[in-house]
């Protein structure tokens, strides 16, 4: 299986750097590597800020070395490689204007204003020039502009950079533009020729960067596309080049192999090949339609989840797709999330014969989230502490207006169904309930064949939160304790929480090592206040419940896409749309297989006989391509012995199995929800 070499924490010990000493010099004194995957490329300060190796502290300070093979190390290498690419582009295509160029997950991009789109031949020429720049060992040198005026003068020929300089202080710290300009000094990085000391190229940038271009040992440019300045379709059109870089050629090659495998597993491609779903233009972008094969898989996914939820004490509810706008005003969605909602429909207005409005219409919205309606269910009558925890669950379809450029098959759609739960509990119940929720999530995800997880803890953004510091600290400590007790790796996400509460995200790695965010467990201090939710405590007082948002799959559609890629289309037998197909050696043996399939259907299995005009070998190829886990063959000997022969997706067979034994084996395999594909060895030992 093709897996990318993951980022590996080296866990260097912090080093005290004396005032006035460059941190790079301190690293050399400690004889830390400057070559290879464990080479130190930047350092991390006590507050988490990354610094160049040229950074010189004003006072004695501790810094932790960051290796090239670590997540942050890779990001810095990619950011620096983006600068090299931009330098190469402007050298190859004089007059090109610079947009922004941040590191992103698994790579980087840079935007350019050019006379014409980039071609594949252009990318090859850019790569060739980049290799020359990297071989030259140019230094990355950080400089601070003395004033805004100095920056504007230096960037007079770069209109997009000038706009960023003029917007300084108004740039979203979470945006890609923040890599170029944000809080603090206005800085630029010069690419300096090590032999002559001349500045070969420079760019407005906050950094940090690797010391020299020789710290970029392996890179590739992957594609180009159209883009808009600052992602706004009303602004200038740009050309974007994507690339990636790694700490070693081996890591880059493993990434390329993974990408090739991922392309084969692309759920959009498999969805069409296996007749699972489609996206008709007549319906609109981002709205999938499930065909019989896909709907069967989806039904099995939902049914198993439904049974598990009932067994775990969840109460099923159902809410409408549309609601008055007042509800989302009350919940705060219209204040904080309006851009992600579809425009309102104005309904219930009345007009007289002359066209005068006698009753103002009301705004109705397609719901983007289920939580406000679940709160109305909680508030529909008085609640006692004896009813808590109350676990409401719904397969609730929601609608979110995603820009067309970010829609991606089933994994980023505009209409999708969440397996959405909202849990209301007392403060005393919170830790136990969170523990149960996390255990339930991991257990259920394992049922579907995912088994490699880690957790991410998103904590308070000090500039954007509701609720007291005390409740944030307590709830964050509880979440952290629950996460640590799970035994799973816990990765911090400082200041990554939504304004209304801390969150645990369950991240899952698939068969080729990619990470997918699966489930979220989100505490909410905001909505119980907005909806004035109350329960009667044991002493008769009215108290606010604590609310937990929990989406296990994220959405049915997205989880479907993840599983489809994880299994490369070969769903386990319990999920497969066609579990068994009978293939007669000749038409005369079809009635024998019809009886076998009828018995399987009577036991609740999906089984049919292929009676098409194709020859047997063609039928086997068709159903192997169609990923049918059990193919049953029958010829003269099988009929005489009241037997069948098994054929599996790997091409192996088990011949002459008595019908009763074959039916029992298949039924048991499916009932067990075995996530492995059946093979000669695994079935032979059962018959």
From Swiss-Prot:
Zn(2+) binds at residues 371, 422, 549. Its main location: cytoplasm. It is found in: Cytoplasm. GO terms for molecular function: ATP binding; metal ion binding; threonine-tRNA ligase activity; tRNA binding. Keywords: Aminoacyl-tRNA synthetase, ATP-binding, Cytoplasm, Ligase, Metal-binding, Nucleotide-binding, Protein biosynthesis, RNA-binding, tRNA-binding, Zinc. CDD domains: ThrRS_anticodon, ThrRS_core. Residues 1-67 form the TGS domain. Residues 266-572 are annotated as: Catalytic. PROSITE patterns: AA_TRNA_LIGASE_II, TGS. Binds 1 zinc ion per subunit. Its EC number is 6.1.1.3. InterPro entries: aa-tRNA-synt_IIb (IPR002314), aa-tRNA-synth_II (IPR006195), aa-tRNA-synth_II/BPL/LPL (IPR045864), Anticodon-bd (IPR004154), Anticodon-bd_dom_sf (IPR036621), TGS (IPR004095), Thr-tRNA-ligase_IIa (IPR002320), Thr/Ala-tRNA-synth_IIc_edit (IPR018163). Catalyzes the attachment of threonine to tRNA(Thr) in a two-step reaction: L-threonine is first activated by ATP to form Thr-AMP and then transferred to the acceptor end of tRNA(Thr). Also edits incorrectly charged L-seryl-tRNA(Thr). Homodimer. Belongs to the class-II aminoacyl-tRNA synthetase family. This is Threonine--tRNA ligase. The gene is thrS.
